[in-house]
Amino acid sequence: GMVGSVLMQRMVEERDFDAIRPVFFSTSQLGQAAPSFGGTTGTLQDAFDLEALKALDIIVTCQGGDYTNEIYPKLRESGWQGYWIDAASSLRMKDDAIIILDPVNQDVITDGLNNGIRTFVGGNCTVSLMLMSLGGLFANDLVDWVSVATYQAASGGGARHMRELLTQMGHLYGHVADELATPSSAILDIERKV
């Protein structure tokens, strides 16, 4: 998906694969060729294979809440003590999890690591962006309250939904391309046609 693809690109750019031995799992492409990041080759492993997952020290998942809700509790109940790093929202409110946004809460992350926390999750994208811009104001007690309203973007649904959105945008553009190419055409007429 989109989140995983962006993560992989960033890890390549920052040479993170130089320091780890990655094993790649999939919920839908078991047995296909795995990415060759970090100089490793092989096939995609079964993301539902608890025994294989239990052998790992760290699991990074961008699979989504359904996967997390199914696999995470089973792993923890089996005694797995590894680090779970997750982009899904499922674990955000758990007492044994920390939402990670290191420019804002590095001290909380460090304290958690020092105190045995092993579950780290990404925050809501809109809230994370807001905190990146307002974090210093919060840290200096300069904000009484914030009211935020958002609309979940298509990107939150993953690559398939982004592709669908772009296809729909293309159809809309095709429907009004002539009018858009004419500077004198009225935008409200174009909007009504769409």
Outline where the language-model segments fall.
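N-terminal Rossmann-like NAD(P) cofactor-binding subdomain of oxidoreductases
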Residues: 1-194
